[in-house]
Amino acid sequence: FIAEPVQGAGGVIIPPETYWPEIQRICDKYEILLIADEVICGFGRTGNWFGSQTLNIRPDIMTIAKGLSSGYQPIGGSVVTDEVAAVLDSVEFNHGYTYSGHPVAAAVALENLRILEEEGVIDHVRDVAAPYLAEKWHALGDHPLVGDTRIVGMMGSLALTPDKTTRAKFASEPGTVGYICRERCFANNLVMRHVGDRMIISPPLVITPAEIDILIGRARQALDECYARVKEEGLLKAAS
């Protein structure tokens, strides 16, 4: 069974509290390997070193990348339990790589991990940035264009809707309003992507409360501008 602890590129989909415990129970019962894709969630993004810790998952294998070097060098890897490693060691396993164990990428990853530890970056996310961002992010839920706010650690999403009461989808082609909102974000010097009509954000782990205030201010301004344009173009209609 392979999954992200929190689905990132799909729209920051945070599972309900009962989801992962049930997945873990089923995998344990039927001896199914549980593989956690930590490419996005790993290395502090959710407020712990790994998203599996945040969601209380016990994976047999974790895939890692991006945060391993903070994006400064292309590097990825797999982390396995002792049980999985023992199986791999017991048989001959031949596999060819064009590149592997590159010394520059490995050195950058080690230095990145040292900095994360010595500067307390993960502690900062867990104790300072994430709680403050969550409070401010959920406050955007009062905007007439926002039907739902979700956030865990430094991963947040806003669901855009033409009707806050029903949280209905737009009648327009999916992503039409999301694209308009994205463009207004860019115009206000805020990098916020859209997945359909859901806006997603993943700010730097070292962001400060003062910088979060700037982020939220720009997000609200972008939402205001998007709302005005959506009304002007007659797009504020719910799907039937």
Locations of the language-model features?
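Conserved N-terminal phosphate-binding loop of PLP-dependent enzymes in the Aspartate aminotransferase
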Residues: 2-240
